[in-house]
Amino acid sequence: DGGGSIRIPASHCGLFGLKPSRGRIPFGPGKLEGWMGLSIQHVITRSVRDSAVLLDVSHGPEPGSRVLPPVGDVDYLAGHRRPPPKLRIALWDTHLFGLPVHADCREAVAKTARLCESLGHTIEPAAPKLPVQDMFGAMGVMTGTGTLVAFHDRAKQLGRDVTEADMEPINWRHYQEARKRSAED
């Protein structure tokens, strides 16, 4: 999950998707993080409990990792059973690009906010002003470069050049765009 590959499908299917913090789930020996750390490994599960169990069995440092999670004993399953502390939750109900938000989506967000308030959490409206174009431009460089490196590695495994038929259209676009950039970009 770098841009929602776990969270988005889960949300569309009534499942649970979590993107753990960077360094929490090891990628495996001899493999660097995807997309310069934006991409994180985990799973889509039927419940928070199932995700907690999988975090318990898969989290932790690995030799050679450049990013280490906080050290200490963590029991995610036990943590899922404890009531959370009172939270201050930012409610951002506008579209990132200023596009209209469907009324059903607005109502789902409002309903969730009311539920969180009923559980004792504080809800505060938020509307951060973000340099969206700059953010997505930088992300495009990072994801494209990561894709380029991954496909060069794949070409070595295959013993031939990677072709458009080997990948999904969005990945081919990332790959083609990255080939136009220099390291200075």
Give the role of each language-model region:
Residues 122-127:
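General small-molecule cofactor/ligand-binding pocket signal
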Residues 78-93, 142-185:
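Short helix-loop capping/hinge segments that flank enzyme active sites or metal/cofactor-binding pockets
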Residues 7-12:
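Structural signature of FAD isoalloxazine-binding scaffolds in flavoprotein oxidoreductases
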Residues 19-112, 130, 153-161:
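A short helix-breaking turn/cap at a secondary-structure junction
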Residues 119:
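Conserved dinucleotide-binding and phosphotransfer motif residues
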Residues 13-17, 140-144:
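Short, hinge-like loop/turn segments at secondary-structure boundaries
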